[in-house]
């Protein structure tokens, strides 16, 4: 992987729970827990579009709007996330380095999916598998967790945008 054309980019990553003080029983009600679950790093890796092309993956038509990827981590819960092919072809990378050095275990060593503009949970750590398909996957992480409750009581899944919630000065 490291022999392929690589790129380095600076990105912000933010936990979807940042500012989540409405949760009951927060252990330590500090600024770090209230607004500090984010960071800015330089990631180095191979653009996912380059990998998909090298593998001969069918990216679909209409700029990838009709295809999806499944990213799976090798962590204890086998964290999985569905990402639209359109997003995957845009700015997503498979990173092996952070801030000029190899990823550390706490940051997803040996590989991490970097997905700018979405919740940090979609930046799959310990990446072990990427699959391409024609519809989103119904994994436990996208059916039971990380869904958005709508005013009408329905749930929205596969949320792909993380609005800015924090200010850094």
Report the location of each language-model feature.
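Secondary-structure junction/capping motif
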Residues: 36, 46-47, 84
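Stable alpha-helical elements in mature extracytoplasmic
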Residues: 44-47, 51, 123
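Short, glycine/acidic-rich beta->alpha junctions
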Residues: 33, 40-44, 63, 105-107
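Extended, aromatic/histidine-rich regions of cofactor-dependent oxidoreductases associated
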Residues: 6, 10, 25, 53-169
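Short Gly/aromatic-enriched secondary-structure transition segments
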Residues: 1-5
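Short, conserved helix/loop micro-motifs enriched in His/Cys and acidic residues
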Residues: 6-40
């Amino acid at each position: 992987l490291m022999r392929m054309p690589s790129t380095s980019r600076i990105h912000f990553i933010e936990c979807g729970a940042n500012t989540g003080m409405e949760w009951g029983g927060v252990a330590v009600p500090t600024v770090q827990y209230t607004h500090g679950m984010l960071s800015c790093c330089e990631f180095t890796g191979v653009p996912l579009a380059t990998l998909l092309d090298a593998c001969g993956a069918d990216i679909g038509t209409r700029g990838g709007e009709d295809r999806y990827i499944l990213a799976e981590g090798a962590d204890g819960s086998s964290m999985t996330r569905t990402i639209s092919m359109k997003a995957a072809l845009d700015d997503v990378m498979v990173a092996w380095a952070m801030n000029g050095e190899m990823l550390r275990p706490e940051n997803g060593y040996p590989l991490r999916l970097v997905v700018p503009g979405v919740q940090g949970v979609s930046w799959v750590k310990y990446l072990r598998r990427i699959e391409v398909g024609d519809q989103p996957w119904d994994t436990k992480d996208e059916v039971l967790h990380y869904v958005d409750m709508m005013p009408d009581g329905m749930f929205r899944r596969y949320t792909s945008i993380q609005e800015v919630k924090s200010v850094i000065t």
